[in-house]
Amino acid sequence: MNILIQLSHPAHFHLYKNAIRNYQEDGHMVFVLIKTKDILENLLQNAGIEYFNILPVAHRGSKLEILWDMIVRDWRIMRFCRKHAIDILSGSTPEVAQVAWLLGLKSINTTEDDATVIGAVIKAMQPFVKCIL
C-alpha cells in the first residue's frame, strides 16, 4: 500500500514517527510530505526518514496569504498522490482531508490540539471527513 503522511509541525513528527516505521516494516511505501516549520526537517533528517518539502517558503501574513498557501499545498499534494499512486493519506492538516476527498481516497485525520485552539483548521477539514481523531 502507498501511504502519504503530511507533517506541518514538529509535534506531528512525534505523533507519526513510530507509525511511519511500523508501516515501512510491514512493507508499505510511506511518503512523508512537509512544509518548512521550525525544526521539523532536522527531526526527520536525524531520524533518517526521507521526506519531500512541498512548501519550503511560506507566505505567512494575511488570511489571504494563508489561504493561498493552503491552495498551493492542495495542488502539490494532489499531483504527488497521482504521481505515486497513493492509496491512503494521513495527517493533521486540512489539505489531507481535502485532497483525499477530491481524489476519492481514504484519509486518517488527526489533531494534536483541542478544537477550540485550532478552530480554523477544524472548519477547513470538517466538511471533507467522517471523523477527526
Feature names for model-found ranges:
Residues 63-85:
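An amphipathic, basic-hydrophobic alpha-helix
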Residues 105-133:
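Active-site-proximal region of nucleotide-activated glycan assembly enzymes
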Residues 7, 24-69:
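Conserved nucleotide-sugar phosphate-binding/catalytic loop shared by glycosyltransferases and other
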Residues 2, 86-88:
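Structural motif
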Residues 38, 89-103:
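An aromatic- and histidine-rich active-site surface loop
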Residues 22, 43, 99, 123-125:
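Hydrophobic/aromatic ligand-binding patch that stacks against planar heteroaromatic rings
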Residues 1-10:
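Nucleotide-activated donor-dependent transferases that construct or modify glycoconjugates
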Residues 10-24:
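Short amphipathic alpha-helix
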